[in-house]
Amino acid sequence: MAQHDFAPAWLNFPTPPSSTKSSLNFEKHSENFSWTENRYDVNRRRHNSSDGFDSGIGRPNGGNFGRKEKNGWRTHGRNGTENINHRGGYHGGSSRSRSSIFHSGKSQGLHENNIPDNETGRKDDKRERKQFEAEDFPSLNPEYEREPNQNKSLAAGVWEYPPNPKSRTQRMLVIKKGNTKDLQLSGFPVVGNLQSQPVKNGTGPSVYKGLVPKPAAPPTKPTQWKSQTKENKVGTSFPHESTYGVGNFNAFKSTAKNFSPSTTSVKECNRSNSSSPVDKLNQQPRLTKLTRMRTDKKSEFLKALKRDRVEEEHEDESHVGSEKDDDSFNLHNSNSTHQERDINRNFDENEIPQENGNASVISQQIIRSSAFPQTDVLSSSLEAEHRLLKEMGWQEDSENDETCAPLTEDEMREFQVISEQLQKNGLRKNGILKNGLICDFKFGPWKNSTFKPTIENDDTETSSSDTSDDDDV
């Protein structure tokens, strides 16, 4: 018995005592109590107190030997012969019978007059032992539920509200999150007196109570199982529940216990409440599926653009702009956290997805790196090149003529020689050489403005290529 002095309160397993146990207790505590009439008187007083006293009052002078506070969580819920049972814990799970066979010879005479008590209390002991096991540990004794349950403890916990077996699998999905709010929203009963659940704010007790297996209950039992503490809980449950945000739901459960249709509606309420976090879990794969489809469309679109280098893009900028808006929106959906700027640097060079991600991305200036001196090839349409260069920030009027000197005849002659050599080598495609110099001088008004940025591009980048990654290509 001494090992229970250092155990926490929830490990105190109440046990059916015997007069042998009482004598053994006296032997273990012989340093506190002498082997004189004191022991005999205390024994008589303990056994006689079971006649008419309540369990909390029946041992006024140390019938419990200082263990009343250890068993205090159990001393106020029963009456009658229960005070016999407040004598300690299981020894290896086996209970001793209440006969005087186990007594040694020296204590035999002292307990002979207790034998009538032992004979009459034996049936009560078995019944109360089952009651102890099934009320506090019903998962250990599922067949107890067939017996009538009349003495209920006032402590409120998960056993007054056993989990609903129909919505159990959904609840286990929610338990994995380990969130107290989700547990309460999914229908777990976390109501009750603060004395019975002292650590209610932490996730530990509620997760533990959600994971404790529920005994296989017959379907008619829960009303009888819950109806005993209805009167006790109506007064105390509302303030505790309202602080945890489940006031309406558990108030409905506590007031609607005695009616079978209301219990079915409670189950429906359980199911609806527990399905809401599960729906949140199910929305994630749905969203990723949609973005996957969008990115597949986008990749196909980009592959098509790479394949034929469509000239309609340069001639029909509005159509391309609308497609690029859709493109960048899909890019934002799939990479909202990474802000990948270029999936294909040839086509969406300067598009950065917006961080807020509300609706579609507004149309931005679409800049193509193919106008720079790379291996990318422009179309042969001069109008498209002109429009593209204007988009890049090059101006058609004579502002650029002030900053660059006009070309001399020697420079033009040298350029033509270089372009002829390159053309002989077969590097000319669609009117553009790979070094980015334009060899056709039919368009006189803007040849200077075209020539200067392509030359300057080697050391100083132009105004519109600040965010481009052409040097890395």
Curated annotation (Swiss-Prot):
Disulfide bonds: none annotated. Residues 119-133, 305-329 have a biased composition (Basic and acidic residues). The keyword DNA-binding applies. It is found in: Nucleus. The modification Phosphoserine is found at S49, S274, S276, S322, S381. It holds the Pfam family Vasculin. Residues 1-26, 44-163, 196-240, 258-286, 305-342, 444-473 are annotated as: Disordered. Its main location: nucleus. Residues 93-107 have a biased composition (Low complexity). GO terms for cellular component: nucleus. Residues 456-473 have a biased composition (Acidic residues). One of its GO terms (molecular function) is DNA binding. The modification Omega-N-methylarginine is found at R87. GO terms for biological process: DNA-templated transcription; positive regulation of DNA-templated transcription; regulation of DNA-templated transcription. InterPro entries: Vasculin_fam (IPR028128). The keyword DNA-binding applies. Keywords: Activator, DNA-binding, Methylation, Nucleus, Phosphoprotein, Transcription, Transcription regulation. Belongs to the vasculin family. Functions as a GC-rich promoter-specific transactivating transcription factor. Interacts with GTF2B, GTF2F2, RNA polymerase II and TBP. This is Vasculin. The gene is GPBP1.
